[in-house]
UniProtKB/Swiss-Prot annotation:
This is SsrA-binding protein. Residues 143-164 are annotated as: Disordered. PANTHER family: SSRA-BINDING PROTEIN (PTHR30308:SF2), TMRNA-BINDING COMPONENT OF TRANS-TRANSLATION TAGGING COMPLEX (PTHR30308). Residues 145-158 have a biased composition (Basic and acidic residues). It comes from Prochlorococcus marinus (strain MIT 9312). GO terms for biological process: trans-translation.
């Protein structure tokens, strides 16, 4: 006998489940982001536990190239509190980012332009994997920051008037 093929399957796609673990709002203020890219990150077990508890700080982080690889530098992930100091990780260690070679080459060519840099924008869970959103951007000058603040305040005023 043939099996009943009319059964409806539930969509249990893990890729639709996103949980933001850390965000770098300062980078969006400090840089004019022109491009974003998703990257995996090579972590230790205690780092994963700390990140899931929300103990990651992306504010001072940036990316660098070494030996054909891209490294995440100066991102602080606090040591896990329930593990002894011998088994814990260094909070500011360099972490390798997992990208395809073509993506690394593209990012390297973008950063060779004057003033361009790669900064982490957010860290989130995608299924059971911890992913990082990287932004390629150029540092803003003081007058650019002031102009952005003016535009934000104008948008807020317009939205408040429209809600009335």
């Amino acid at each position: 006998m043939a099996k009943n093929s009319n059964k409806v399957r539930k969509n249990t796609n893990k890729e639709n489940n996103f949980k933001r673990l850390a965000e770098n709002r300062y980078a969006k203020f400090q840089y004019a982001i022109s491009e974003t890219i998703e990257a995996g990150i090579e972590l230790l077990g205690t780092e994963v536990k700390s990140i899931r508890n929300g103990k990651a700080n992306l504010r001072d982080g940036y990316c660098s190239f070494r030996d054909g690889e891209i490294l995440l530098l100066n991102v602080h992930i606090s040591p896990h509190k329930n593990v002894g100091s011998f088994f814990n990780h260094d909070p500011l260690r360099n972490r390798k980012l997992l990208l395809h070679k073509k993506e690394i080459i593209k990012l390297k060519s973008n950063t060779e332009k004057k003033g361009m840099t790669i900064v982490p924008l957010s860290m989130y869970l995608k299924g059971s994997w911890i992913k990082l959103t990287l932004g390629v951007g150029k540092g803003k000058k003081l007058h650019d920051k002031r102009q952005d603040e003016k535009q934000k305040s104008i948008k807020k005023e317009i939205n408040s008037v429209l809600k009335r």
